[in-house]
Amino acid sequence: MAAPSGGFWTAVVLAAAALKLAAAVSEPTTVPFDVRPGGVVHSFSQDVGPGNKFTCTFTYASQGGTNEQWQMSLGTSEDSQHFTCTIWRPQGKSYLYFTQFKAELRGAEIEYAMAYSKAAFERESDVPLKSEEFEVTKTAVSHRPGAFKAELSKLVIVAKAARSEL
């Protein structure tokens, strides 16, 4: 029997993280915003948690077409130790060509992140980017110059509250 694929393990990790958070997650906040083409760098940012403890900022540049309606959903665990940020186009696939993207967190360190070229819509499933197309650091998910193929429709980030130094 062949070993499970990388996609299988990604799904297992995401499911485990989601189950861990689902046990005690506050109602997420979802905010619509426009992704605007034109090649200019734009940013959209939202805060969540007690005292706006966490911030998720989506910075991008894209080309083609007209504005697209996207959404950013933010949620925290009841103990405010975990944070989720999901950025996506609810209609599924984006028709814009992204020249760059970066989702950056403040107040938390990333435990899991995935980028998708196509978001689930109706009977279609999410289509993840190839791992070489994006990179994940402790606080950001971003395109990998030269490898990113300009398709983005969704970002999912699960993070844990950053430890404060005593």
UniProtKB/Swiss-Prot annotation:
It is found in: Secreted; Endoplasmic reticulum-Golgi intermediate compartment; Endoplasmic reticulum; Golgi apparatus. Induction: Up-regulated by ischemia/hypoxia and reperfusion (IR) injury in the left ventricle (at protein level). Up-regulated during adipocyte differentiation (at protein level). Expressed in prostate, spleen and lung, and weakly expressed in the left ventricle (LF) and liver. Expressed predominantly in inflammatory cells, such as monocytes and macrophages, and weakly expressed in neutrophils, T-cells, B-cells, endothelial cells and cardiac myocytes, after myocardial infarction (MI) (at protein level). Keywords: Angiogenesis, Apoptosis, Endoplasmic reticulum, Golgi apparatus, Secreted, Signal. InterPro entries: MYDGF (IPR018887). Residues 1-24 form the signal peptide. GO terms for biological process: angiogenesis; apoptotic process; negative regulation of apoptotic process; positive regulation of angiogenesis; positive regulation of endothelial cell proliferation; positive regulation of MAPK cascade; positive regulation of phosphatidylinositol 3-kinase/protein kinase B signal transduction; positive regulation of protein phosphorylation. It holds the Pfam family UPF0556. Disruption phenotype: Mice show normal postnatal body mass gain, develop normally and are fertile. Show larger infarct collagen-rich scars and more severe heart contractile dysfunction compared to wild-type mice after ischemia and reperfusion (IR) injury. One of its GO terms (cellular component) is endoplasmic reticulum-Golgi intermediate compartment. Bone marrow-derived monocyte and paracrine-acting protein that promotes cardiac myocyte survival and adaptive angiogenesis for cardiac protection and/or repair after myocardial infarction (MI). Stimulates endothelial cell proliferation through a MAPK1/3-, STAT3- and CCND1-mediated signaling pathway. Inhibits cardiac myocyte apoptosis in a PI3K/AKT-dependent signaling pathway. Belongs to the MYDGF family. This is Myeloid-derived growth factor. It comes from Mus musculus. The gene is Mydgf.
